[in-house]
């Protein structure tokens, strides 16, 4: 199986967790795009979706899936999203697509977080993938200096503006042994909107696409 076929298998497997007549939280990225294709096959059975990015919103609307503003929704039974890295404790690094803040907000609302990945995303220790940090533009240099003090090597992601109008610093060379602690430390830096560690709110179910099929971890 190609990597994309493994992503597709994980994306379609997530349909099992979608409840009839519910509003579904939908993330962002290449694996999620396969889930959106799958979700479109049962659009008549759901009330609609809440999206974590403009890109996912556009794709769902094009497929005829109603998309709601999160502020108009009281509850979400599930949130389905991918990850750039995930460890055995269901802690993740996300934000390669720069949608981390909205992803984190939708994940916080949802009762259950279903993470869909291919098997290249499973790691023992987080940090080989650079950790994205969304930053208010005027604070970029200050935040970068603080991230260096935490042992990281921040690099400004040129030409990228988030859906919220902010910038991204990608932090390299961090072996993240305590994801929850680091998530809190970085979020406490003035000027940081949020960072791509999803440890305080990790995944509840992991669906891993592999050449052998889809593995489920709970």
Swiss-Prot record:
The keyword Transcription does not apply. Keywords: Isomerase. Transmembrane segments: none annotated. GO terms for molecular function: ribose-5-phosphate isomerase activity. Substrate binds at residues 28-31, 81-84, 94-97, 121. The keyword Isomerase applies. GO terms for biological process: D-ribose metabolic process; pentose-phosphate shunt, non-oxidative branch. It catalyses: aldehydo-D-ribose 5-phosphate = D-ribulose 5-phosphate. The active site is at 103 (proton acceptor). NCBIfam families: PRK00702.1, rpiA. Homodimer. This is Ribose-5-phosphate isomerase A. It comes from Shewanella sediminis (strain HAW-EB3).
């Amino acid at each position: 199986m190609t990597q994309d076929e493994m992503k597709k298998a994980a994306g379609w497997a997530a349909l099992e967790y979608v409840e009839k007549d519910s509003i579904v939280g939908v993330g962002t990225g290449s694996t999620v795009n396969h889930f959106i294709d799958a979700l479109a096959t049962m659009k008549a059975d759901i009330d609609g979706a809440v999206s974590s990015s403009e890109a996912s919103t556009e794709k769902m609307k094009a497929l005829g899936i109603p998309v709601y503003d999160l502020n108009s929704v009281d509850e979400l039974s599930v949130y389905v999203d991918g990850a750039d890295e995930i460890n055995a404790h269901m802690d993740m690094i996300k934000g390669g697509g720069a949608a981390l803040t909205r992803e984190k907000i939708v994940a916080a609302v949802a009762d259950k977080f279903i993470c869909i990945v291919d098997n290249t995303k499973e790691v023992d220790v987080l940090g080989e993938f650079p950790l994205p940090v969304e930053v208010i533009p005027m604070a970029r240099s200050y935040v970068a200096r603080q991230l260096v003090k935490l042992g990281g090597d921040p690099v400004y992601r040129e030409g990228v503006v988030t859906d919220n109008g902010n910038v991204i610093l990608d932090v390299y060379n961090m072996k993240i042994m305590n994801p929850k602690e680091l998530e809190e430390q970085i979020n406490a830096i003035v000027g940081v909107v949020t960072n791509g560690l999803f440890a305080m709110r990790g995944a509840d179910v992991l669906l891993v696409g592999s050449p052998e099929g889809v593995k489920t971890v709970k």
